[in-house]
């Protein structure tokens, strides 16, 4: 009874805290209270801006403190714990898959077992199994073609299940091709086949290049603290210079992991252990495996957001989740705008869906988890309201001031990233703010509206499928902004600029123009010439493994 009473108090206190945070932001936004301002409010600094500034400052500070703890290192893992690496593969680009498997062969952890499950068992998918046999060699390797999967086995189909489990138990390297079912299905197969035969499970995508020490670094954190249930590593971009969209995405990735997740890790509440590089206690996975697989939302089975829901399941049990920049990998990101937009929409859907689930467990973790979830969850809606309000006030200066503010915040964050990373190239991160405002922001709102729609979201990399649905919210957003510009032009034509306003406009326009001229000139001079080529300009060594041994034989039931 005392335990239930304490839990009830924590739930009540957490709910009140969340309402206090949201209410405070809402009051600051609605009242528009300003600390300082010019005579005609051309420039001002208010309570709402102070709250957002304090949030960014706090987040950066805690991220810095967590990085300082990471640099301290710790004891090396014993090497006695059993670890299995599970790779999910779906229509993968052969070049990326080879790089992934070669990096797996270079992992420094002894006796690491590997399971790759291919989502598809047709002849078109066979090349992935062939690459697995080619790279992994024949010693301790077995491949299996399954006509079904765990959830489509008919009566008497236990033979296929037993075959999978026997191979996983007896071979070090296993590749399974199974009937198509989505990423969650192939991940389930790997986890289910393992059972309780291992202590830790590492996850990886088939487009990921792993650093040799990544397994040992994540395992070290799990062995040091029994209260940590999962840990993620630093995921950066493999094809950074392949296009402008992948180049800008590389900065977003760095900020997401080395600032946002590092800050969450300081409080032990990382809210998403990314699929390309993560590790979990297998005992936890086996405990909630069925609930994770059968997850539903508004009566529909969930088919995306697997990684975030895995993390949420760990958090729901009261275990902490951590991030370490000492464990690194490189992964592919979309190089085309439409594919990137669809990916971001899918991720946004899973974010908002999992936000609701995550809220059930706020009371089990540090208050920072509650605070950050409220701020980041509601921020896009406040931002949309701000943009619409400024574009429809009928003054050109309001629009220009908003654009200047967006870029100023971007420059400040980019400067911090330059200092923290020690790389001047991070200054280009400020360009991402425009991509966020024009594309990612409407995609987030669209994700909320269409949150029940499911699917892979992003096509396989071998055969790219163009999906124009992502352009719908962007087109609507541009129409809204265009309407604001037309309305502003109409209002200003009937209300000429004052001398002071004209001075502000000219100064602001010159500053904004100089910013873009400087950044675009640097981009064209230093970066553009490198884009469009698959250059191996990686931070991680990619030595070739030794010549593969004769291929292992594939088994078909």
From Swiss-Prot:
Domain of life: Eukaryota
Protein name: Hyaluronan synthase 3
Transmembrane region(s): 11-31, 45-65, 368-388, 399-419, 431-451, 464-484, 502-522
Cofactor(s) listed in the protein's UniProt record: Mg(2+)
UniProt organism field: Xenopus laevis (African clawed frog)
Localization (cell): Cell membrane; Golgi apparatus membrane; Golgi apparatus, trans-Golgi network membrane; Cytoplasmic vesicle
GO biological process, any: hyaluronan biosynthetic process
Molecular function as annotated in GO: hyaluronan synthase activity
Gene this protein is translated from: has3
Catalytic function, reaction form: [hyaluronan](n) + UDP-N-acetyl-alpha-D-glucosamine = N-acetyl-beta-D-glucosaminyl-(1->4)-[hyaluronan](n) + UDP + H(+); N-acetyl-beta-D-glucosaminyl-(1->4)-[hyaluronan](n) + UDP-alpha-D-glucuronate = [hyaluronan](n+1) + UDP + H(+)
Extracellular side: 32-44, 389-398, 452-463, 523-557
CDD domains, per database record: GT2_HAS
């Amino acid at each position: 009874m005392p335990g239930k009473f304490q839990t009830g108090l924590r739930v009540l206190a957490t709910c009140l805290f969340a309402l206090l945070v949201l209410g405070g932001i809402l009051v600051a936004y609605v009242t528009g209270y300003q600390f300082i301002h010019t005579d005609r409010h051309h420039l001002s600094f208010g309570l709402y801006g102070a709250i957002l500034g304090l949030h960014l400052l706090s987040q950066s500070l805690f991220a810095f403190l967590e990085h300082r703890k990471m640099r301290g290192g710790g004891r090396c893992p014993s090497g006695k714990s059993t670890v299995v690496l599970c790779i999910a593969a779906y229509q993968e680009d052969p070049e990326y898959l080879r790089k992934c498997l070669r990096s797996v062969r270079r992992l420094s952890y002894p006796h690491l077992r590997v399971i790759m499950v291919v989502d598809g068992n047709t002849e078109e998918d066979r090349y992935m199994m062939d690459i697995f046999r080619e790279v992994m060699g024949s010693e301790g390797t077995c491949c299996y073609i399954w006509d079904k999967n765990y959830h489509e086995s008919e009566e008497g189909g236990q033979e296929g299940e037993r075959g999978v489990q026997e191979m996983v138990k007896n071979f070090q390297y296993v590749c399974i091709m199974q009937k198509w079912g989505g990423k969650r299905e192939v991940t389930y197969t790997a986890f289910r086949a393992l059972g309780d035969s291992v202590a830790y499970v590492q996850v990886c995508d088939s487009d990921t290049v792993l650093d040799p020490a990544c397994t040992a670094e994540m395992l070290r954190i799990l062995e040091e603290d029994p209260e940590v249930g999962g840990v993620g590593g630093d995921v950066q971009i493999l094809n950074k210079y392949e296009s402008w969209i992948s180049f800008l995405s590389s900065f977003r990735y760095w900020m997401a992991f080395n600032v946002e997740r590092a800050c969450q890790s300081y409080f032990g509440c990382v809210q998403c252990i990314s699929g390309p590089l993560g590790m979990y206690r297998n005992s936890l996975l086996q405990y909630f495996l069925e609930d994770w697989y059968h997850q539903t939302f508004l009566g529909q089975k969930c088919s995306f957001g697997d990684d975030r829901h895995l993390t949420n399941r760990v958090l729901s049990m009261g275990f902490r989740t951590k991030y370490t920049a000492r464990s690194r990998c490189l992964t592919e990101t979309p190089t085309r705008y439409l594919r990137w937009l669809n990916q971001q929409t899918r991720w946004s859907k899973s974010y908002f869906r999992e936000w609701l689930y995550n809220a059930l467990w706020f009371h089990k973790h540090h208050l920072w988890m509650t605070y950050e979830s409220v701020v980041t969850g509601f921020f896009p809606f406040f931002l949309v309201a701000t943009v619409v309000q400024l574009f429809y006030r009928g003054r050109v200066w309001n629009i220009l001031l908003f654009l200047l503010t967006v870029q100023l915040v971007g420059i400040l964050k980019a400067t911090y990233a330059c200092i923290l990373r020690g790389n001047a190239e991070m200054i280009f991160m400020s360009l991402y703010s425009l991509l966020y405002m024009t594309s990612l922001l409407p995609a987030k709102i669209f994700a909320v509206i269409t949150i029940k729609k499911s699917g892979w979201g992003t096509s396989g990399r071998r055969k790219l499928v163009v999906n124009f649905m992502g352009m719908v919210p962007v087109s609507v957003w541009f129409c809204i902004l265009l309407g604001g510009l037309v309305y502003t032009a109409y209002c200003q034509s009937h209300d000429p600029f004052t001398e002071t306003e004209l001075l502000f406009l000219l100064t602001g326009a010159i500053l904004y123009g100089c910013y873009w001229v400087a950044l675009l000139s640097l981009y064209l001079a230093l970066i553009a010439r490198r884009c469009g080529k698959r250059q191996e300009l990686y931070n991680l060594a990619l030595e070739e493994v030794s010549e593969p041994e004769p291929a292992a034989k594939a088994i078909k039931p």
